[in-house]
């Protein structure tokens, strides 16, 4: 897997060894993974300006792109699901949140805990959303609060990916 140091800054991994990075993912510079987190195929995490932190039991799915600008670090909370082809740029995502496939979050955006950003949503610069929000559209807006059932669904998604990366860590073998 391509893991690069840049200007003396290298990605950091949990001491307990409980994480997984797909061999086609790219991690550069200031990237910090927490325990039970995973980075999937084709994802790029480019910590060349500020830190990118991936919280415990969170996953970055296939072909997601994460980048920062000076003054805009990125923190992804615990138990988060970052969907396929999501683009995150210098934003903050609260615990137990799901960012749907193809969503874009720009510098300074803040997503509260237990929130769901719909597929294809565009969260503009410095836009902030409260906890328990269902966020959709372009530009993104809150359409309602998340109920306990939806919050449990997000948590279940994080659980599935913890089991999945453990399966891949043990059983994935290159055959060609």
Residue ranges and their predicted role:
Residues 2-15, 74, 78-82, 86-87, ...:
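C-terminal segments of enzyme domains that contribute to small-molecule binding surfaces
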Residues 17, 22-23, 28-29, 34-35, ...:
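Left-handed beta-helix
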